[in-house]
Amino acid sequence: WDAIRFEVDHRDEDGQFMLTGSAVPVEAKKIHHTGTGRYGWLTMRPMSLWESGDSTGEISLSDLFLTPDKIGALNKLTLPMLAFVVCRGGWPKALQKKTEKAALLQATEYYKAITNSDISRVDNVKRDAERAKRIMRSYARHQGSQASIATILADISTNEPEDVSDETIDAYLTALRKIFVIEDMPAWNPNLRSKTAVRTSNTRYYVDPSVGVAALGLGPNDLINDLNTFGLFFETMCVRDLRVYADALDGSVYHYRDKNGLECDAVVHLRNGSYGLIEIKLGGEKLIEDGAKTLTALSNIIDTSRMKAPAFCMVL
């Protein structure tokens, strides 16, 4: 790090080096210079369905912003195929496996490594592997919600041999964030026509749905037999892909929820002020129509005299 920083100053040119990190980030105290003005930070995420070859890529996020009225394509992914890609995840190594069974093991082994070693290695604090598993299982059950630390604590406390504090749960979650296992989604706070209290709690998500599936010990058939659970993991996969595509457009992904219960799963907001509203539904005509009604309701309360109207509304 420091040697490259010196070389960057010496050459005085852009785009010379690319540094990639491991699952456990380097200790900050070992770095003598922050790199401000020399380094740009880029979050590397698991592969999207387009990158893993499971999506045709016929509809791009940029097209939705630029020409939403000229969108048309047919999705060929069946329910069993979706269940498989949710459980397999976006891990490059999983694509190299010769069988589906071997591909599914990749996320399971990653989950074991997280709980047995990575969660302790991140800051050299010994953490209990079984407690880490309980917290990750609870987090998986609450993904897509604004579950508080107190909720997660109540969820795991019956299986805890001793009293656990909120601070302990928070420390485990912080460690999981540092090693890029979970990534909460911040709240979106638009200009509204009326004074409505907007909820500001983050929404819980795994960086990749396969880790949550592995935490609960589920497989593709389990998801197909429980569409409610499948829907939660499908949402996490969609959020993963939206984040990948939004990053490429220099955008961010948020969620919206107000005191009246009006909720929007994802808002992709670009730096130029353009944004799209997205409801995520696994399928079913009624659920899709419900999603469309929600998007229309949210669009109608946005004060377009103080901010842009949505570039698009999409049921994903």
Residues of each region from the PLM?
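Interdomain motor-coupling "hinge/lid" segment immediately C-terminal to the ATP-binding subdomain
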Residues: 21-24, 28-145
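Accessory nucleic acid-recognition modules appended to NTPase machines
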Residues: 95-274
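Substrate-engagement module of ASCE P-loop NTPases
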Residues: 5-14, 301-303
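Sensor-1/coupling segment of RecA-like P-loop NTPase cores
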Residues: 9-31, 176
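Conserved AAA+/SF3 P-loop NTPase catalytic/coupling segment centered on the Walker-B
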Residues: 1-3
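Structural motif
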Residues: 274-276, 312
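Conserved beta-strand scaffold positions in the cores of enzyme catalytic domains, especially
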Residues: 39-43, 253-255, 313-315
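Catalytic cores of nucleic-acid endonucleases
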Residues: 282-316
